[in-house]
Amino acid sequence: MENMPVYMIVNLKINDSDEYRIYEKGFFPFLKKHNGSFITFDDSPECLEGNKPNQFDRVIIFSFPSEQDADNWWNDPDYQELSAHRRAATDITLQKIKGMTPRT
């Protein structure tokens, strides 16, 4: 299972656009530094089943080639300093999903 990709799924609600913009501008250099890849985002995700959590209005998905890369990104002290802007500006859930080999 080593070197399996890791996917990050973010659900968030932006409460302070100016503060979040500071975070957003600094996010991509850290993603690149830790070998991450932006996949997509959606400001109006469609809930096909169940109840859409009303507190969130944006979904973001990005990935890393390994769990170690994801952990290095998360634990980077400079990234954590930047993420203070995100924490101040949003309500958020962030999930780390480990890639798995398809079952046969």
Question: Predicted segment positions?
Answer:
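Short S/T/G/P-rich N-terminal loop/turn motif that feeds into the first structured element of a domain
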Residues: 1-75, 98-104
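C-terminal structural segments of small proteins and small subunits
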Residues: 71-73, 78-91
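Short, electropositive alpha-helical surface patch
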Residues: 93-97
